[in-house]
Design a protein with these regions (language model features):
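N-terminal [4Fe-4S]-dependent radical SAM core
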Residues: 1-32, 44-81
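The canonical Cys-X-X-Cys-His
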Residues: 39-42
Length: 158
């Protein structure tokens, strides 16, 4: 757990979509920059160099604010990976709702979505996710052992 609260700020971005070189998707979509999970094994910590933060990865979160997606049908049949370098269902998603806003803006577009998370908050949006023609959810659990979790400073699963 954090010794202090994470640094959270809202940032305006021109677009929520990033063209991707990943073999699993055409676009990488991350509603947040940073991650408040602070996992010791995190592969996304390289993203810090693209921020203005001096703080360690896992102690800050930039909440992306983007213009409404004007032509969501442009993404029909395209593979969108939501959460490639952040968890789109961080605890802060309850307050900011950026992932839900993204899904609502894409609803009916015909986009194929993949979502990676370790949060049960995704259940809130399950009915919305089901409206996409092809939707995949990857849900990771790093341990079921609460003692191990606590030793590594991780939040509880609930």
């Amino acid at each position: 757990m954090f010794a202090r609260s994470p640094i959270i700020r809202e940032i305006e971005v021109k677009s929520i979509f990033s063209k991707s070189n990943l073999p699993v998707c055409e676009y990488s979509v991350n509603p947040y920059v940073g991650c408040t999970h602070g996992c010791k094994y995190c592969y996304a910590c390289f993203m810090k160099r693209f921020t203005v933060h001096a703080e360690p990865w896992g102690t800050f979160l930039d909440v992306k604010v983007w213009p409404e997606i004007k032509n969501p049908e442009k993404y029909a049949g395209k593979e969108l990976f939501i959460g490639s370098v952040t968890d789109p269902y961080l605890p802060e998603e309850e307050k900011y709702g950026r992932t839900r806003a993204l899904l609502e803006q894409l609803q009916g577009s015909g986009a194929k979505i993949s979502i990676a998370t370790k949060s049960d908050l995704i259940m809130r949006d399950l009915e919305l996710i089901k409206t996409f023609p092809e939707a995949r959810v990857s849900w990771s659990v790093n341990t079921l052992n609460e003692d191990f979790r606590a030793e590594n400073g991780r939040r509880s699963l609930h």
